[in-house]
Regions:
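Membrane-interface extramembranous regions
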Residues: 1-135
């Protein structure tokens, strides 16, 4: 059960990292790197001519979907929800996370995309899907 709780915690922590896109950025320092979590600069929405208000609304929807999907998966891992919710929860959370991270891409966000891809792969592997989750 400890492994299941740790994995559920990981899923929730990964989901909640996306809140950094709407949280205030820390103060910039002279030699510090730029804050990678920003909804003000999107290569995708800028090219499509989407305004900043709509861009932020789309980002909020993707953040909420990411948190919701990974929360369902975490509750499924702990046994609070049926195990059949595991794969759809991961798929919903990871796909919306990837969409957010690509739309507002910064090189540091590549790690998050990698995590999402691994979670999708793991959730659809026969050994860990459905009722046979062995985490």
């Amino acid at each position: 059960m400890l492994v299941r709780l740790a994995f559920a915690g990981f899923l929730l922590a990964h989901a909640l990292m996306h809140v950094a896109f709407v949280a205030p950025a820390p103060p910039a320092t002279a030699d510090g790197p730029a804050w990678p979590f920003s909804t003000s600069e999107s290569w995708l929405f800028t090219r499509l001519g989407v305004g900043p208000e709509t861009t932020r609304l789309v980002a909020l929807a993707l953040i909420a979907t990411t948190i919701g999907g990974f929360s369902l998966a975490a509750l499924s891992v702990t046994g609070a929800l049926p195990t059949g919710i595991w794969a759809p929860g991961i798929a919903i959370g990871a796909v919306s996370s990837i969409a957010l991270l690509i739309a507002f891409f910064h090189p540091w966000l590549a790690l998050g995309i990698g995590i999402d891809l691994i979670l999708i792969w793991a959730s659809w592997s026969p050994a860990v899907s459905g009722p046979q989750i062995q985490v």
